[in-house]
Design a protein with these regions (language model features):
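Short active-site neighborhood of thiol/selenol oxidoreductases, capturing the structured segment around
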Residues: 51-73, 79
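Positively charged n-region of N-terminal signal peptides that target proteins for export
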Residues: 1-5
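Thiol-/selenol-based redox modules, centered on thioredoxin-like
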Residues: 138-176
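N-terminal "domain-start" segment that seeds a small globular fold
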Residues: 22-51
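Structural micro-motif
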Residues: 113-115, 133-143
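Structural microenvironment flanking redox-active thiols in thiol-disulfide oxidoreductases
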Residues: 68, 73-111, 122-127
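Short loop/turn microsegments at loop-to-beta-strand junctions
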Residues: 35-36, 58-59, 139-141
Length: 176
C-alpha cells in the first residue's frame, strides 16, 4: 500500500472520529439549572418567550434536528399522540428546530400537531441549551422546565424520540 493511500485513509478515519465525538457531546445543562430564557417565532404566528410561562405552567422543549425527516417525524407524531398526557399534567409542549418558520408550518400542518413549533433559525437557542451540532442543527434533546423556570428532566438522543419520559416527568413536576 502506498504511503499516500495510508495518509489519506488515516485522515479520513481521524475525521470520522472527530465528527463522532462532536456529535456525542451532551448538553452542558443539568436538572436543577435555570432554563435559559428565549423568544422564538412560532408556527402560530406569535413569538413565544419562555419566561412568560414562569409561575403558570410546566413547559416541554423538544429540540429536534430537521422537519420532514424520519426520526423527527416519528418524534413529533409521538408528542401529538400523547398530547393529552401533557395537558393533564398542565404542561405546554413546544417542538424546536433550526428550520425556518415556513418549513415548520408545513411540517406541523402535515402532522396535524396541536402544539406550536418554534423556529431557531439563527441557532442561538440551540447553542444556549448546548444542543447545537457542528452540522448546524439541533441535536435531539428534550427539556422539561417547571413553573419556576428550572430544568427538571432532560432526555437526549434516541431516548428523546419517545414522549413517555417527558410525560412522566411532567406528572412528577405536577405533584410537587
Amino acid at each position: 500500500m502506498s504511503k499516500t493511500l495510508i495518509v489519506v485513509i488515516s485522515i479520513l478515519i481521524l475525521g470520522c472520529l472527530a465528527v463522532m465525538v462532536m456529535l456525542a457531546q451532551k448538553t452542558h445543562l443539568k436538572p436543577g439549572d435555570t432554563a435559559p430564557d428565549f423568544t422564538l417565532k412560532s408556527t402560530t404566528g406569535q413569538a413565544v418567550t419562555l419566561s412568560d410561562f414562569r409561575g403558570k405552567q410546566t413547559v416541554v422543549l423538544a429540540f429536534f434536528p430537521k422537519a420532514f425527516t424520519g426520526g423527527c417525524t416519528r418524534e413529533m407524531k409521538g408528542y401529538q399522540a400523547g398530547i393529552s398526557e401533557f395537558e393533564t399534567a398542565g404542561a405546554q409542549v413546544f417542538g424546536i428546530s433550526t428550520d425556518d418558520v415556513d418549513t415548520l408550518k408545513r411540517f406541523s400542518t402535515e402532522l396535524k400537531t396541536s402544539f406550536a413549533m418554534l423556529s431557531d433559525a439563527d441557532h442561538k437557542v440551540s447553542a444556549q441549551y448546548g444542543v447545537l451540532l457542528p452540522v448546524g442543527f439541533a441535536g435531539r434533546t428534550t427539556f422539561v422546565v417547571d413553573k419556576d423556570g428550572r430544568i427538571q428532566h432532560i432526555e437526549e438522543g434516541s431516548a428523546a424520540i419517545e414522549h413517555s419520559g417527558a410525560a412522566m416527568a411532567c406528572k412528577r413536576v405536577q405533584k410537587k
